[in-house]
A protein has these predicted regions:
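Short phosphate-engaging motifs
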Residues: 250-251, 263
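Short intracellular "coupling" helices and adjacent cytoplasmic loop segments at the cytosolic face
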Residues: 257-266
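TPR/TPR-like alpha-solenoid helical repeat scaffolds
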Residues: 265-275
Length: 362
């Protein structure tokens, strides 16, 4: 009798374990899919921001030089053309939260994707809707700037909504690590576009690059953007967003796919409770932390990282390097950025957030 009892207990625990393992593998696969789709928004953030680096000289040759401006005015216009997307980033960052609340996290990412698409198409062909494709000239510099600002708005929205989507879809015990992959995707986007710019530059000489090559660099973004938009239609909105928009049934369905049934119900109830609470006291309690977080982002810009990300090829050209060689050197910048982001992700749970931020500040 004891032998049979032992066997029954063993079989019970064995079947329970196998059931849990099967459920866990299934939920992990689904969670990885959702995370990968969301991080494509981060990749496009890096791609759209970094693509300009390979086109600075060409944009100056195409849009600025024919205007016959004085050196100071010429440099100022070139700088504005290159950095114009940042205007859109400010707008996108300011309205991203409101859009996410009104339309949901998924739809916000779709909006960002559409803006990326419009920007990539318009930046590569600013004469579109104005004259024959390929017949544009320096008079369209303002149109080009407009399309870059559109892309910047997409960057601002994606920079906010991609990590929010991941954070709201992931279980608490995996949230921190999965959200960090969005940063990896951003620097990955920079690295990928540096490679793309380099190989496009190899397709012709500087004359071809200044006339047509820069167009292909901007147009290349259409490929990842299209993939992003298609994949977004295969994923759901986040449970929190679904509850906010009175779709609790769908929210529970999503939660069950990444958690066991009992935990899914508990999380759903927690979401409903938190949405009923006022956020003002919570913000007041953590105001200092929020300020520090914002200042970290501000100081990151103050160290001049964007100068390197935007102008690396031009900096290397001052060393009398050819355009393709300068773009090849820029790839190394992207690789170093990517590798150290991986190191940060792998060590953050060992050393903690604060020590790594101190090391980065030093």
């Amino acid at each position: 009798a004891t032998k049979w009892k032992t066997r029954i207990i063993w079989e019970y625990y064995k079947s329970t374990y196998l059931k849990y393992k099967k459920l866990n593998n299934k939920s992990n696969g689904y969670l990885i899919k959702l995370t990968l789709v969301a991080t494509l928004g981060g990749l496009l953030f890096g791609y759209d921001t970094g693509v300009i680096s390979g086109t600075v000289g060409s944009l100056e040759s195409f849009f600025v030089d024919p205007k016959g401006l004085a050196e100071y005015e010429s440099s100022r216009l070139t700088g504005f053309i290159v950095s114009s997307a940042l205007i859109g980033c400010i707008i996108g960052g300011a309205i991203g939260g409101l859009i996410g609340k009104m339309f949901g996290r998924k739809n916000s990412l779709i909006i960002a994707g559409v803006l990326f698409f419009i920007s990539a198409l318009g930046s590569s062909m600013p004469e579109m809707f104005i004259t024959t494709i390929g017949q544009g000239d320096h008079t369209l510099s303002n149109v080009f700037i407009f399309y870059r600002i559109i892309g910047g708005i997409g960057v601002g929205i994606a920079s906010m909504m991609s990590p929010v989507y991941i954070a709201e879809i992931a279980p608490a015990n995996k949230r921190g690590k999965l959200v960090s992959y969005n940063q990896l995707a951003i620097v990955g986007g920079f690295m990928v576009v540096y490679f793309v710019n380099y190989f496009i530059a190899l397709s012709g000489d500087d004359s071809w690059l200044n006339e047509f090559g820069w167009r292909y660099m901007f147009a290349s973004e259409l490929i990842p953007v299209t993939i992003f938009l298609i994949l977004l239609y295969t994923v759901p909105d986040t449970p929190r967003s679904l509850v906010y928009h009175d779709n609790e049934e769908k929210a529970l369905e999503v939660l069950k796919k990444v958690n066991d049934e009992k935990e899914a119900v508990e999380i759903l109830n927690d979401i409903k409770d938190t949405l009923k609470e006022k956020t003002a006291p919570l913000f007041t309690y953590g105001f200092g932390i929020v300020v520090i977080g914002v200042l970290l982002s501000v100081f990151q810009q103050f160290v001049g990282i964007n100068v390197v990300l935007y102008y690396a090829p031009e900096i290397f050209k001052t060393l009398d390097l050819a355009t393709d060689t300068a773009l090849l050197q820029t790839i190394l910048v992207g690789i170093v950025n990517f590798l150290f982001t991986i190191i940060a992700i792998k060590t953050v749970d060992i050393y903690g957030r604060k020590p790594l931020m101190i090391i980065g500040a030093i």
